[in-house]
Amino acid sequence: MVQLVSFKTSRFDVTQETPNESNAYAGESVLRWLGDELAKHRYESTPPDMEDWGWYIDVKGAGNSYLVGASAGVEYKDEPGSALSYDVTPNVMLDWTIQVHKSRTVMQKLLGKNKLAVEDPLCVLVERI
């Protein structure tokens, strides 16, 4: 199961992000911010990294491990010979999706234990932040 949080904001300047080499999905800036916010609540996270569907961080805390992803669809600039960059103005309003996946052992999966739920502490925190 996955929990999704969607929102619209211009708070994150994706023009300062490392362009995702797999496709035109931003997410690095929102995950850097989210990782800093989670650290204030005793969660540890890795630096953001690219995935073919966007960006992700690994998060540990409250006795559990999670993969937290983020993405906002943007376009690349179409300039032959130029470096890969997003074709948006700084601080443009974008639709964001954050997804939370909870890591479970094979035994937990077989026994139906430790499932991700809406009331999971990390899900509640991500929605509150």
Give residue spans per PLM region:
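N-terminal low-complexity, intrinsically disordered segments
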Residues: M1-P48
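Long protein-protein interaction modules used by eukaryotic assembly/scaffold proteins
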Residues: V2-E21, D58-I129
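Short, low-complexity intrinsically disordered segments
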Residues: L31, E51-W53, L94
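Short, intrinsically disordered low-complexity segments
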Residues: G35-V68
